[in-house]
Amino acid sequence: MDEVCAAPAPKKMVAKSLVLNTFRKASVKEVVELKKPWKKVLWRKQDYPDNFIDESFLNGLQRNVNIQVTDFWSLVADSLPVSQHLSSVVIFASVFVSIYRNQLSCALVGFVSNVSAVAAFILWDFVLRKPCNNRTFPNYMGIVKSCILIVLTLAGLSPILMSLTKSTSPDSVWAIAVWLFLANVFFHEYTTETIRPHVRLHNSLSTNAALSASVVLASRLEKSINVFFFILFAVHWFALFPIFRKYIHVFSFYADMLMTLVLIISAYIALNAVASVVIAFVFLSLIFFISFICPIWFIKLQRFKNEIHGPWDIALPKLGPSKG
C-alpha cells in the first residue's frame, strides 16, 4: 500500500496566519507602550500592580549623607569634661574622708574654697567671658547679695543639718551618698560646645543630687562649723566649678587640657592618700579608657554606620528669613 503523505498547507493560509501573529504582537506592544510611566506616588492609581518595582525605584537612594567623620584628637577633647567631672567627684569624696578622719581641717577647706571662688570669678569676669560672646554686664551688687544670702542660710541651717542623720546607721548614709553621686555623674551635662544661659533639667538634677549627697555626708560631722564650711565647699565645687570648667573648655583647648591633668593628678594623689595605690591605679585606668580607648573604639565602629536617605523621607522645612 502506498504511504499516505500529508498535503502541504495552501500558501494563502500560511500568509494569513503570519499576518495574524504579526498583528497580535503589534497589539501587545502598543498596549505596553500605551501605559503611562510608573511614578513613585501612592495617591495616584496607576496601571501597575501594587508589588511592581521599577528599575528607577532606588535611583534616589543615598547612604551616610549626614555622617561626620571625626578624628582621634577631637574625640579626646570631647572626652575631657567626663574625665574632669569624675576627677572632681573623687576629689570631693577624698576631702570628706580626710575631714571625717580628722586629717584635714574643715576651716582650711572653706578658706581655700572661698579664695578659689573669688579668684575664679575675677578670671571669668576679665578673661573668660569675652571670647565666649557673653556681652551681658554682670550685676555685681546682685551677686554679692546672693552670696551673703547663701552664707547666712547655710550658717542658720548648719545645726539642723548636723543632726539630720543621727538616728541613721553609717552604712545607710554611705550607701545613700554613693547613689546620689552616681546620679550626679549620670545626669551631668557634658556637652560644652556653647555656653547656654538657661538651665537644663538633667543638669539641675545632677547639681541637686550632688548637693544632697553633700548634705548627707555633712550630717556625719561633729561640729556645726564644720558642716557650714563643708556645704559651702560643696556649693562652690558642684554648682559653680562646672560652669567655670565650661568657660575654660570654650576659651582654650590647652587650658582645658592643663586643668584636666591637674584634676586627674589631684584625684590620684587624694585616692592614694585616703584609700590605696590599687584603687588610685584603677581610677587612672578608667580615665585612660574613657579618654583614649573609647575614641579609638568609636572610630572603628563608624565604618559599620549605614544610614539611608531618599525622596521617600519626610520633608524637612527649611526655616529662614522670608523674601520680599
From Swiss-Prot:
Residues 101-107, 162-171, 245-250, 300-324 are lumenal. Keywords: Endoplasmic reticulum, Glycosyltransferase, GPI-anchor biosynthesis, Membrane, Transferase, Transmembrane, Transmembrane helix. Its EC number is 2.4.1.198. GO terms for molecular function: phosphatidylinositol N-acetylglucosaminyltransferase activity. GO terms for cellular component: endoplasmic reticulum; glycosylphosphatidylinositol-N-acetylglucosaminyltransferase (GPI-GnT) complex. The chain crosses the membrane at residues 80-100, 108-128, 141-161, 172-192, 224-244, 251-271, 277-299. It comes from the Eukaryota. Pathway: Glycolipid biosynthesis; glycosylphosphatidylinositol-anchor biosynthesis. The keyword Oxidoreductase does not apply. It catalyses: a 1,2-diacyl-sn-glycero-3-phospho-(1D-myo-inositol) + UDP-N-acetyl-alpha-D-glucosamine = a 6-(N-acetyl-alpha-D-glucosaminyl)-1-(1,2-diacyl-sn-glycero-3-phospho)-1D-myo-inositol + UDP + H(+). It is found in: Endoplasmic reticulum membrane. One of its GO terms (biological process) is GPI anchor biosynthetic process. It is a multi-pass membrane protein. PANTHER family: PHOSPHATIDYLINOSITOL GLYCAN, CLASS C, PHOSPHATIDYLINOSITOL N-ACETYLGLUCOSAMINYLTRANSFERASE SUBUNIT C. Belongs to the PIGC family. This is Phosphatidylinositol N-acetylglucosaminyltransferase GPI2 subunit.
